[in-house]
Amino acid sequence: AAWAAHKYLMHGPLWFLHADHHTKEPGFFEKNDYFFLIFAIPSWLCIMLGMMYGVSESVAFGLGIAAYGFTYFLVHEIFIHQRFRFLQRSNSPYWNAVRLKHKLHHKSLTKDGAEHFGLLWVPLDWIRAQKKKA
């Protein structure tokens, strides 16, 4: 779901929010940061309404969105883009491959032509290549 949202929404009709993420603009915040609200609000509503009305599937769905959001924040914002200065180095072939794949995604500065939309999935041969570099 996250892969499809990134490829077909963020690199599609919502590019006006995502574009500044592919170019380095001055300042700490990006329009891309609005996606936090776009995903956090439905997550919160699913959890809250699910608890109020006893719909466990709604709570589970909301918690799933929240868990992905937390993972995204740690991996994408902290580890990959270094928006906060910790988790800067890694000796892990997997995490180095994740960082490389994301760097290749950012080679495209337009909404068309980008590749590698997933956050955590990396082909095994990429991990092996990073292992050889270590």
Q: What residues fall within each predicted segment?
A:
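Hydrophobic alpha-helical transmembrane segments
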Residues: F61-G62
